[in-house]
Curated annotation (Swiss-Prot):
Gene name, Swiss-Prot/TrEMBL: rhaD
Lineage, uppermost ranks: Bacteria, Pseudomonadati, Pseudomonadota, Gammaproteobacteria, Enterobacterales
Pathway it works in: Carbohydrate degradation; L-rhamnose degradation; glycerone phosphate from L-rhamnose: step 3/3
Entry's Gene Ontology molecular function annotations: metal ion binding; rhamnulose-1-phosphate aldolase activity
Descriptive protein name: Rhamnulose-1-phosphate aldolase
Protein family according to the UniProt entry: Belongs to the aldolase class II family. RhaD subfamily.
Amino acid sequence: MQAILSSWFIQGMIKATSDMWHKGWDERNGGNISLRLLAEEVEPYRRDFYQQPRKVELTQPAPELANSWFLVTGSGKFFRNVELNPAENLVLLQVSNDGMAYDIHWGLTQGGLPTSELAAHFQSHIVRMQVSGGTNRVIMHCHATNLIALSYVQKLENASFTRLLWEGSTECLVVFPDGIGIVPWMVPGTDGIGTQTAEQMREHSLVLWPFHGIFGSGPTLDDAFGLIDTAEKSAEIMVKVLSMGGKKQTISREQLIALAARFDVTPMAAALDA
């Protein structure tokens, strides 16, 4: 048996949370991450599990995730503290076989619960599992500064917001050809915002919460981080462009189509026409 603190998933979560905090995306207890794990990935670390796991009822049943394992950031925990004490700030949990509850097997050594956005994470995991054939295993939420800033001055519409980001940096269409989805402003930590986010996740791997932050999905922690990082970099460029008086020239529709053909991706049609 191996020590869980040396596992690839704990070490990966330490790196992701540290990187996100250093980016300035996760002030105080802002942001949350969940990583879906396979049973064989957690099995070698059972000696570190609690002998009597704590059971917590889900606010919304998730039978599609029955028996699934997740590594999740804790509610009220600071990303900057994860690398200092991962066992206090992270939690390894398993959804019950009926999808009505979960058991806490490791972590949260000072008590507490997984992220308050667990409902949004689980609903998004269900959808991304379906649309990706099970390859998407990460849901990541943070307060990316420039994406939030743009939500105050741009029309909150999927196609036009996507087009703006595609024009902000050439790599964007290649990295997220499926564009960005947007939900209305809603109270966070509720089942309702989770439902709205999951609906957008059916078509988009990025979902903007206006005036709040961004949700991203991907196969790995690196993929999800890189996705958000790319969109945020484009948003930063566009914030600077707007502050200098707006665009004088930009990437054209024809150039975007040529870019998609070169990298063999299918761009969001509505964004091409926005």
